[in-house]
A protein has these predicted regions:
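An alpha-helical interface "stripe"
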Residues: 1-169
């Protein structure tokens, strides 16, 4: 018997399934690193899947720990490159971090190139609702944020005339 104790099924960590079966992933606001403006979960999932050896060489003790020094160094470097070169250039050319190079997007493969097709299929397009971006106590949030492999592409502030929200609000 179980002596009145409930038996809990084993919990398996699994990526959120694609949004509506169309290749979109649902991002979580808690995965958004406000200091660096990156969806860390989507970024690290992409890097682990496409460049596992380089990702391991980052030597993060715990990639989910925001205080891990190697995690901080990598995210700060990536954020600085985005600030300097822009997100499109970083997606196209990747980023250098010490001796390592990281590709951050895989473009449309040529026909018959199975390796490129496999890498392209690992790109992660995600949508995050209620994206808190302010670093202060106001906790201001955007209605939607769009990301490719954890890098921000677009934000949306949705308005509703039925609730008297307009572009001026």
């Amino acid at each position: 018997g179980t002596d009145g104790l409930a038996i809990m099924p084993a919990v398996v960590a699994e990526a959120t399934p694609p949004y509506g079966g169309t290749g979109y992933f649902v991002g979580s606001p808690k995965d958004f690193d406000r200091a660096n403006a990156l969806d860390v979960s989507q970024l690290f999932t992409f890097l682990r899947a496409t460049q596992p050896e380089a990702f391991e060489k980052l030597a993060m003790g715990d990639p989910s720990d925001p205080k891990d020094i190697n995690r901080l160094k990598f995210l700060t470097r990536l954020s600085a490159e985005i600030g300097k070169r822009g997100v499109i250039d970083v997606l196209r050319k990747g980023v250098e971090h010490g001796p390592l190079h990281f590709d951050l997007f895989y473009g449309t493969p040529s026909e018959g190139n199975e390796k490129a097709a496999a890498l392209h299929s690992q790109n992660r397009f995600s949508v995050t609702r209620q994206l808190a971006y302010s670093m202060d106590e106001t906790r201001r949030a955007l209605d939607l944020g769009l990301f490719i492999n954890g890098l921000p592409i677009a934000t949306f502030e949705l308005k509703n005339s039925l609730t008297k929200q307009t572009v001026e609000d």
